[in-house]
């Protein structure tokens, strides 16, 4: 893990009218680092991610990606800049199969001898899909099934495999194992470990304390829209994290943290 700053935010803030969903978030993520964001529902975790990825436009603040200040107009801009995100809503196309979902917006093409327009190369996309699923140990019985005909767990695994297939500059996972079974959760956690081994930085939003303690380097705690703690995972425990989440413990370094 190097000292290169992958992502930095300064005074990142989002207001919805009189509701201060996110207030003054200062955050840094280093190259190869895996950071968890924790907090109760409504604490500001997902709001923070939506500002970074361009899903929403911030009220104020600044964002840098690898040293360049960015202001994404939408999620597509963020993805083109190298940010791969697994949202809670998955963002999958129900009527498309697995290869079409993995390559949606970045389809492989081949030369068309009959005209000036290139053709979709379905064979290469299917082969790349199988290779990507094998590499991430995600088991999908039939990749030609549409997403609509898959279980919730299979859908989640497809969304995460899509993220892991394309080596990103930054991966963000928002509750990636929510409502998954034991086996599917293990598959997702295996993907996270593979990203770590590859040196790819990750932001993980999770309520799963066991998972967080097993997978990340550092834990950021949000409470009432503010960052209240920045904890080295090796120097803390679940009880300490919960104390910050509930407000039983406050971060002296963070104004308005109580």
Segments from the language model and where they lie:
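Glycine-rich phosphate-binding loops of nucleotide-dependent enzymes
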Residues: 2-258
